[in-house]
């Protein structure tokens, strides 16, 4: 199963032990092929530095850990779908470029789409339920 996790899922997985954390554990265990793009990693760096005021060393360690679990795909920045928050377009384009089945998000701007072509936009809890059903 292939997926893209948006930045809020990645940040939640880093700091808390809820559903996003379990999604990241599934990727670490090889149950999920996780994909990111340079703009997603850049946003992760910005959020960790600006919002959480983490040291550059800690940020580098976290981003390195995400890179260790995920495959990085290049995007062009030409997808323009999310009218209410164009900065979310990078997640959709990454999902399309990586040909994933799921975009895991907690962002209502993305979740309202439900499906974008072949990509289903789901919450972390929904993704865990899907993973659980697929392993039975």
Place the predicted regions along the sequence by residue.
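Active-site neighborhoods of divalent-metal-dependent phosphate/nucleic-acid chemistry enzymes
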Residues: 69-102, 108
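PIN/NYN-family metal-dependent endoribonuclease catalytic core
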Residues: 5, 15-50
């Amino acid at each position: 199963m292939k997926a893209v996790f948006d930045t809020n899922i990645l940040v939640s997985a880093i700091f808390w032990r809820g559903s996003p954390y379990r999604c990241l554990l599934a990727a670490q265990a090889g149950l999920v092929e996780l994909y990111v793009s340079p703009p997603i990693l850049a946003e992760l760096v910005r959020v960790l530095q600006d919002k959480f005021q983490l040291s550059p060393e800690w940020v580098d360690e976290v981003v390195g850990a995400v890179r260790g679990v995920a495959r990085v795909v290049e995007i062009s920045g030409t997808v323009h779908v999310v009218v209410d928050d164009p900065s979310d377009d990078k997640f959709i384009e990454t999902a399309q470029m990586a040909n994933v089945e799921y975009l895991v998000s907690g962002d209502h701007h993305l979740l309202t789409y439900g499906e974008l072509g072949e990509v289903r936009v789901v919450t972390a809890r929904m993704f865990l339920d899907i993973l659980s059903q697929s392993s039975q």
